[in-house]
C-alpha cells in the first residue's frame, strides 16, 4: 500500500485542481451600510451539458477511520463541485491529475478550519471526508440531463495519513 501524507491546503498548492474557498485574499468590500464584509468571487461554479443548472444542496458527512484507505476516486464531467463546511472543522481533500488510463497518483490536503474547496470540472477526487465527527456541508454542483459521475477503482489502495 502506497503511503501519502496530507499537507496543508493553500491556494497555490490546490490551484491545479480547483479553488480554495475562504476569507483570505484582498477581494472583499463592505456591503449593507458597512455592517457586512463581502468576500467576492471566491470560486467559479461550472455547469455544462443538456439542461444544465447550478444546484445548491446540503450534506451531513460521517468521518472515516484514519489512516484513510483510498481505493476509489470519482469525477464529474459536466460540472464543478464545491464543498463548504458549515462548522469550523477541517476535512480531508484528495485529488488526482488525469493520467493516460485513469487518475494519476493522489495528492492529499487537510483544510484549515473554515476553508472550503471547489473541484474543477472533470477532476478526479476522493469522497467527502470529514475528520473526527460528523460534519455538515453546503454543496454547489451541477444538475441536468446525463450522468455527471464517473468512478475509478485503483488496482491497489493508497493509505492517507494526516501530518
UniProtKB/Swiss-Prot annotation:
HAMAP family: Ureidogly_lyase. InterPro entries: RmlC_Cupin_sf, UAH_cupin, Ureidogly_lyase, Ureidogly_lyase_bac, Ureidoglycolate_lyase_dom_sf. It is an enzyme of class 4 (lyase). CDD domains: cupin_UAH (cd20298). Pfam families: Ureidogly_lyase. Homodimer. Belongs to the ureidoglycolate lyase family. Keywords: Lyase, Purine metabolism. GO terms for molecular function: ureidoglycolate hydrolase activity; ureidoglycolate lyase activity. Its EC number is 4.3.2.3. Transmembrane segments: none annotated. Pathway: Nitrogen metabolism; (S)-allantoin degradation. Its cofactor is Ni(2+). It comes from the Bacteria. Gene3D superfamilies: Ureidoglycolate hydrolase (2.60.120.480). One of its GO terms (biological process) is purine nucleobase catabolic process. Catalyzes the catabolism of the allantoin degradation intermediate (S)-ureidoglycolate, generating urea and glyoxylate. Involved in the utilization of allantoin as nitrogen source. It comes from Mesorhizobium japonicum (strain LMG 29417 / CECT 9101 / MAFF 303099). The keyword Aminoacyl-tRNA synthetase does not apply. It catalyses: (S)-ureidoglycolate = urea + glyoxylate. This is Ureidoglycolate lyase.
Amino acid at each position: 500500500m502506497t503511503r501519502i501524507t496530507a499537507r496543508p491546503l493553500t491556494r497555490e498548492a490546490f490551484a491545479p485542481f480547483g479553488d480554495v474557498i475562504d476569507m483570505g485574499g484582498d477581494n472583499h468590500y463592505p456591503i449593507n451600510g458597512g455592517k457586512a464584509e463581502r468576500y467576492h468571487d471566491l470560486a467559479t461554479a461550472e455547469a455544462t451539458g443538456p439542461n444544465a443548472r447550478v444546484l445548491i444542496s446540503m450534506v451531513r458527512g460521517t468521518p472515516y477511520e484514519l489512516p484513510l484507505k483510498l481505493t476509489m476516486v470519482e469525477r464529474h464531467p459536466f460540472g464543478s463541485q464545491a464543498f463548504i463546511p458549515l462548522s469550523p472543522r477541517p476535512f480531508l481533500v484528495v485529488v488526482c491529475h488525469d493520467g493516460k488510463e485513469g487518475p494519476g497518483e493522489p495528492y492529499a490536503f487537510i483544510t484549515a478550519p473554515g476553508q472550503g474547496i471547489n473541484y474543477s470540472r472533470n477532476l478526479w477526487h476522493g469522497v467527502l471526508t470529514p475528520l473526527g465527527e460528523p460534519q455538515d456541508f453546503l454543496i454547489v454542483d451541477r444538475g441536468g440531463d446525463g450522468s455527471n459521475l464517473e468512478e475509478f477503482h485503483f488496482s491497489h489502495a493508497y493509505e492517507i495519513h494526516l501530518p
